[in-house]
Regions:
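N-terminal structured subdomain of primase-like DNA metabolism proteins
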Residues: 1-105
């Protein structure tokens, strides 16, 4: 049986390391004010401007397509076209957070 994922803890850890996380997820992104503006790797994006991620709270949006989300896990899920659970596990691995197989006692 798999352990329950602590989405809140994973999101909190991701936000604490968000500059490095964003660098890895969106290489070439540019800091503009409190946001990272990057090309959207999910579409044939040729210009910076419409895909933005808030560096402090993790909210993100692609204003050209209407896609948006509220936290780092949803960003990873969107970019990888994967489920929220898969995204949480991927982000946890990236951050060195153990999510499964914990032994107690």
């Amino acid at each position: 049986m798999k352990d329950a994922l602590d989405f809140a803890a994973i999101n909190q850890a991701a936000l604490a390391a968000f500059p490095a996380v964003l660098n890895r997820l969106l290489p070439g992104g540019k800091a503009i004010g409190g946001e990272i503006v990057a090309l959207n790797p999910r579409r044939a994006d040729r210009r910076l401007g419409s895909f933005r991620v808030n560096r402090y709270n993790g909210r993100w949006a692609d204003f050209a397509t209407g896609d948006k989300g509220g936290d780092p896990i949803s960003l990873v899920a969107y970019l990888g076209n994967i489920s929220q659970g898969e995204a949480a596990r991927m982000l946890a691995r990236m951050l060195g957070i153990e999510t499964e197989g914990r032994r107690r006692g």
